[in-house]
């Protein structure tokens, strides 16, 4: 386990950290709740993340979304989140989907 997760490992134990590292989590929507969720998952040691959102950062997101800064306005939220994740841990596998998950689009996703 990487040193950056050593404090978490003290709390959870080695076996739990290995489970986190081997886990894959999909997050639907990288806005007010999803953005913070992605950040927490990355900082917790989850090994793979699927990010699903077709929205771009806009000015009205600045007061409430972690992916929103003046620099990121106009960028896809999944791209901003992926960059942030890799700044936290470059070894996390990130798959981005620039599409909204709906009954009509569900066949375009592979979560196996």
Can you say where each PLM-predicted feature lies in the sequence?
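Hydrophobic/small residue at the entry helix of a nucleotide-binding pocket
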Residues: 33-34
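Aromatic pocket-lining residues of Rossmann-like dinucleotide-binding sites
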Residues: 41
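Glycine-rich phosphate-binding loop and adjoining beta1-alpha1-beta2 segment
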Residues: 46, 51-89
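Conserved N-terminal Rossmann-fold NAD(P)-binding element of oxidoreductases
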Residues: 27-29, 52
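A structured beta-alpha segment of the ubiquitous adenosine-cofactor-binding alpha/beta core
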Residues: 74-112
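N-terminal charged helix/coil linker that caps or initiates catalytic domains
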Residues: 1-26
């Amino acid at each position: 386990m990487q040193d950056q997760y050593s404090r978490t490992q003290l709390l959870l134990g080695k076996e739990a950290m290995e489970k986190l590292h081997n886990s894959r989590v999909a997050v639907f929507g990288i806005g007010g709740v999803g953005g913070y969720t992605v950040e927490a998952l990355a900082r917790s040691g989850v090994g793979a993340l699927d990010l699903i959102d077709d929205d771009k950062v806009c000015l009205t997101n600045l007061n409430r979304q972690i992916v929103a800064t003046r620099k990121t306005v106009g960028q896809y939220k999944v791209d901003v989140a992926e960059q942030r994740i890799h700044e936290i841990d470059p070894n996390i596998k990130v798959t981005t989907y620039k599409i909204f998950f709906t009954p009509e689009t569900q066949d375009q996703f592979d979560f196996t």
